């Protein structure tokens, strides 16, 4: 069989719980082309999904600014202006990381917080210091250390430290995220 065209596959993160739930979606809203708009599905009956939806709503204004910033950077040909816009984009990324960190700290028992922390350790280079990574792991330790998933988070955190700010990586050291 042929490999599927992953650009045309609809996907969304849904937190499913073992209880009655509904998943309302408008099939005409599924994007058939990359730039088509999509009507977001509505999941009801999952407390975890509600927490994730609250996170998305918190991040939405910042992400909207990021999308506009990315468009501006891509449309600008003046190098000095692109650099200035890129510096603004870095500040927005820092704001996103800050808001995500606060959200994780406020929802330590939630699977959403666990997933967000796991994602936080996935970027290369890691936008945190080793000390910050240890501190972040401490946020979830009490609630998650006895879970089967926690060793995976620990492993990802240890891998993230290899490219953390201030650590020697391959042939250089990342001093700051800029």
Region roles according to the model:
Residues 1-91:
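A non-transmembrane, solvent-exposed segment enriched in polar/low-complexity residues
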Residues 63, 67, 108-123:
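Amphipathic alpha-helical repeat scaffolds of TPR domains
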Residues 88-97, 127-134:
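Helix-turn-helix repeat elements of alpha-solenoid scaffolds
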Residues 96, 103, 120, 140-143:
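Alpha-helical solenoid scaffolds that mediate protein-protein interactions
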Residues 100, 129-141, 167-172:
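Alpha-helical repeat scaffolds
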Residues 106-110, 142-151:
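Short solvent-exposed coil/turn linkers within tandem alpha-helical repeat scaffolds
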Residues 151-178:
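N-terminal "domain-start" segment that seeds a small globular fold
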